[in-house]
Curated annotation (Swiss-Prot):
GO molecular function: DNA ligase (NAD+) activity; metal ion binding
Essential cofactor(s): Mg(2+); Mn(2+)
Gene3D superfamilies assigned: 5' to 3' exonuclease, C-terminal subdomain (1.10.150.20), 6.20.10.30, BRCT domain (3.40.50.10190), DNA ligase/mRNA capping enzyme (3.30.470.30), Helix hairpin bin (1.10.287.610), Nucleic acid-binding proteins (2.40.50.140)
Organism expressing this protein natively: Lactobacillus johnsonii (strain CNCM I-12250 / La1 / NCC 533)
InterPro entries (alphabetical): BRCT_dom, BRCT_dom_sf, DisA/LigA_HHH, DNA_ligase, DNA_ligase_AS, DNA_ligase_CS, DNAligase_adenylation, DNAligase_N
UniProt name for this protein: DNA ligase
Family indicated by similarity: Belongs to the NAD-dependent DNA ligase family. LigA subfamily.
Limits of the BRCT domain: 590-668
Amino acid sequence: MAVLTHNEASQKVDELRKKLDKWADDYYAKDAPVVEDAVYDKTYQELVELEEQFPDLVTADSITQRVGGEIKSDLSKVEHPVPMLSMGDVFSKDELKEFDERITKLVGHSVAYNVELKIDGLSLSLEYTDGKLTRASTRGNGRVGEDVTANAKFIKDIPQTLPEPLTTEVRGECYMEKEAFATLNAERDEKGEQVFANPRNAAAGSLRQLDARITKKRNLSTFIYTWVNPPRNITSQHQAIDEMNRLGFHTNQSGRRFESMDEVFKFIDEYTAKRNDLSYGIDGIVLKVDDLSLQNELGNTVKVPRWEIAYKFPPEEQETVVRNIEWTVGRTGVVTPTAVMDPVKLAGTIVSRASLHNPDYLREKGVRIGDTVKLHKAGDIIPEISSVVLSKRPKDSKPYEIPNVCPSCGETLVHLQDEVALRCINPMCPAQIEEGIIHFASRGAMNIMGLGPRIVKQLIDKGFINDVADLYQLTPDQLGQLDHFKEKSITNLLSSIENSKQNSAELLLYGLGIDHVGAKAARLILEKYKNLEKVSQLTVPELTSIDTIGETIAESLTAYFNQPSAQKLLQELRDSGLNMEYLGTVEEEAPDNFFKEKTVVLTGKLSAFTRSEFTKKLQDLGAKVTGSVSKKTDYLIYGADAGSKKDKAEKLQVPMLTEQEAIAKIEK
């Protein structure tokens, strides 16, 4: 790492934290990772090294001082009396040796390890009172998780009653077997619903359901591997596993006790080779000091136990041949290249396609038709070309020529300013129309259940719809002509379409799929201007008067509504009975109070509530909670170990409240 000044390090730390917070939120709260594990781990390690080099930059809210992600769901919250910590990660055998040497130095002698498979699932705590299951919860941020007790009662291998009247807590992993995952995705695909990216996401989404009946259908499983307060006669990790197994918990029997690192490495090699043959997913191997008294002696850091470490498998690579490069058109006109390859088994699934993202990426990789390429799965999820094997390139190979016409409508493709993507700007492009209707019906927009990609394609192919307004003119007779569409499906879809007419107008605005206008921007615009027809007449200055709405969003929105076709579509939707009004939020209905219409920033370690809970309380009072201090900030609320935000507030003379002072004003 290059030598940085203190100011440069401070800026870099802020940049890394923002990235990691976003990625952690996608992973933990949304069950939708957007970067591969290796990218996340490298970025996280860079932050750790900077904080070690500049200790004064460490803050209580840094991701290096937290476990997991903030809790963002409607499930009840559960506080963990004993925090559910995450594990430290290593990525090589040399790092494992260093871990062993560190343990040996700390305890003064060599130790035995219980070596276990690292299950790719969601952490789960099970609490029993007098032998009966009383609570199940997720890890959440390590201190506060989510109550999933009702759902746990429908997981077949979780004992509801123990053979002995124990009051205890055990922990493990909730996962979905590969076969159950394949069945679930096949069912969702058949219904036109979005499929899950991987078994871990499927398990997390299934366990965290508000409706336990859905969990029951998802066929989840568990492996239990930790006993929080084991009986005194249990003195080792391997003994704890055996005893938990005797009590009826589902434990993984592949783990072994080793006294040398050579044995550990052989175990790693064994499961690296056969991981894809297992019925469940694993993403590494876990080493745990076997002696429980030594575990207690070694203790924990603020985030991870010192007595255990996770070895992460390197990405598996395979070679295959590129046979074609296909281009597909998205709803905003972006045209994306995809490599079509000879099918190859990779990380347990057959892969024959990999995205090449954009023309610059394609040129950078230098991929040509006929090339042999090395392929891996980013984060064990997304197929990605690592490199071209130049030694195997055919002698008659020619550089690939980027197309200049749209593969759907034949119009000339363009590069817009400051964009790497190619675009089709023909508003009547069939592919864009299809993708636009799919987006309109999606859960984040109009939420028309049962209107997935397959159904949309059939409706377009049969000439029943040409734009989103046509959805509201569909008849039972038309839907009856679709493949595998029976009476119940017809009734449900028409009912969902009818119900969508009552949605708040920001969902309709987002559903229109205007470039750069995401769900948050749509909500902010409608919060201020209330009516979608009024929004369609706004100018760029009127739109940019809204905090966080910049010129890019404003210009895109005004350009869209300046098109006669857009005004015609809006009129057709209004005539079909769609609501054009913003229906409001809790914040608008808040009575007069100290924080109403104030801009507030939280910083430091809060004790009475989690940060997300405190934020929600303030928002319910009509406050706007932001992440950074500026001249527009009305109040900074700070807890223990407040850092740079408090310093900045002092410089800007922003009024400050302690956590307790703020709570007192909330409770007035």
